[in-house]
Amino acid sequence: MQALVGAETGGYRLADNVEKPVLQPGSILCHVKAVALNPHDAKIVDYSNVPGALGGCDFAGVVVEIGNGVKRFKEGDRVFAVTFGMNASDKTAGAFTQYAVATEDLSCLIPEAMSFTEACSMGLAIATAGLALFQTPGLQLSMQGGNGEAVLVSGGATATGTMAIQFLRIAGYTPVVTCSPSNNALCESFGAEICFDYHSPTCGADIRVQTGNKLRHVLDCVVDISTMKMSYDAIGSSGGAYVALEAIPTNIKYTRRDICANWLMAPSILGTPVNKKGAYGRPSMPEHRQFGTYLFALAEKWLQDGSIKHHPIEIREGGLRSIREGIDDLRRGNVHAKKLVYPLSA
């Protein structure tokens, strides 16, 4: 089969004659119909390339084989799933391939009315937003009984941002977001209560006023010095918690001792060690896998009843051969408020 793998000289290369993965108990083999790109796909190959390992995290396809113990799915089912490419522990894990393996518990059935190109955009957003909001080192919010408390999502128009907005609404919180004014309507369509222009030099202070100096929780989906400073300005005088999706700037982290600041690696949802160098490595976190099992079962239900929807997508043609162009666009910051999606087969 064809697959996009880590090249020995860096970046990705298109490989032919890659062997199909061997199924493990509790896993499903899928004929991939569409894949979505994420900033993670560019960063991981640039900073932690694993030559010969499959790339990609998000795919949708048709189940062609089930492993021992699988009960939720059968051959012929349409599913989407999250996996994590560039995995030194399992080079056959990844989405950028004609046949991909996923675990039963981190996969969802696709509703009849949803296309593969729409569905493939959801897996990583579900995993990342869920961990960031409801687990440690995330914000550890309750999944029920938010009682209208405001939670700030910095980067509300990102794929993780729009999923987080929806999760917050379901859990009973009030999502407050930052975004470009051109994306206000988008964020509001996902459930944002109010949007603030992150370009404004008084953005953080304005949010603090709007939230009555009581804001306690911030999810930063952008993560740079300016967004972290803005988030710290927004959190009320009693302090709170800040979680980011990237390593956080230490020159801002300790400017307020009443704020607990941390960041997470979404691959920890697998429950196995994240074998990356330095701060990007993570020990095994079985509790994240247990949460992921619970979350993806809920997400399947929410998707079926219309409680959540996918982020806007941009469909690009060319299949696996063209993915590297999309990765370059992500590197250059040319993709805003949408996910790039590539159909692989009819």
Swiss-Prot record:
Keyword Nucleotide-binding in record: yes
Induction line: The fujikurins gene cluster is specifically expressed during rice infection.
SMART domains the UniProt entry points to: PKS_ER
Key words of the record: NADP, Nucleotide-binding, Oxidoreductase
Residues the record lists as binding substrate: L124, A125, I126, A127, T128, A129, G130, L131, A266, P267, S268, I269, L270
Pfam families, alphabetized: ADH_N, ADH_zinc_N
Record-listed E.C. numbers: 1.-.-.-
Binding of NADP(+), residues: 40-43, 157-160, 180-183, 198, 245-246, 335-336
Gene3D superfamilies, A to Z: Medium-chain alcohol dehydrogenases, catalytic domain, NAD(P)-binding Rossmann-like Domain
Zinc as UniProt keyword: no
Molecular function GO labels: nucleotide binding; oxidoreductase activity, acting on NAD(P)H
InterPro entries named in the record: ADH-like_C (IPR013149), ADH-like_N (IPR013154), GroES-like_sf (IPR011032), NAD(P)-bd_dom_sf (IPR036291), PKS_ER (IPR020843), Trans-enoyl_RdTase-like (IPR047122)
Residue pairs linked by disulfide bridges in the UniProt entry: none
Function, in words: Trans-enoyl reductase; part of the gene cluster that mediates the biosynthesis of fujikurins A-D, secondary metabolites playing a role during rice infection. The polyketide synthase PKS19 acts with the trans-enoyl reductase FFUJ_12240 and the polyketide transferase FFUJ_12241 to produce fujikurins, however, the biosynthesis pathway has not been identified yet.
Family membership noted in the UniProt record: Belongs to the zinc-containing alcohol dehydrogenase family.
Name under which the protein is recorded: Trans-enoyl reductase FFUJ_12240
